[in-house]
Amino acid sequence: MDHKPLLQERPPAYNLEAGQGDYACGPHGYGAIPAAPPPPPYPYLVTGIPTHHPRVYNIHSRTVTRYPANSIVVVGGCPVCRVGVLEDCFTFLGIFLAIILFPFGFICCFALRKRRCPNCGATFA
């Protein structure tokens, strides 16, 4: 292996004189962003001791709502066995009032219907 130094000479020093511009960025001052003005001085206390201690109150309130795990809810499904689908059935009284009070009896018939599960036989009003 050859142990020669990679650079024979030292690189030239970086000296950018005023008035000399880098031609890659354009002439000096053209399109340059002016320097920001210095920030204003900070006000100092004369005594050096703070006159009061500010009180800081941190009040945090967070409402956490927990939802049950995702489950499939069947519309019209039986809440007892969770297998059957509820069917509507009319009561005897509802059918009787529908016949006796013919035009208005249908309101009674639909108001007095029951829901029944064909799987487990549970009835709901």
From Swiss-Prot:
Localization per Swiss-Prot or TrEMBL: Lysosome membrane
InterPro entries assigned: BRI3
UniProt keyword Membrane present: yes
Protein topology in the membrane: Multi-pass membrane protein
One cellular component (GO) term of this entry: nucleus
Key words, A-Z: Cytoplasm, Lysosome, Membrane, Nucleus, Transmembrane, Transmembrane helix
Pfam families: BRI3
Reported induction: Up-regulated during TNF-mediated inflammation and immunity. Up-regulated by beta-catenin and TCF4.
Function according to Swiss-Prot or TrEMBL: Participates in tumor necrosis factor-alpha (TNF)-induced cell death. May be a target of Wnt/beta-catenin signaling in the liver.
PANTHER family: BRAIN PROTEIN I3, MEMBRANE PROTEIN BRI3
UniProt name for this protein: Membrane protein BRI3
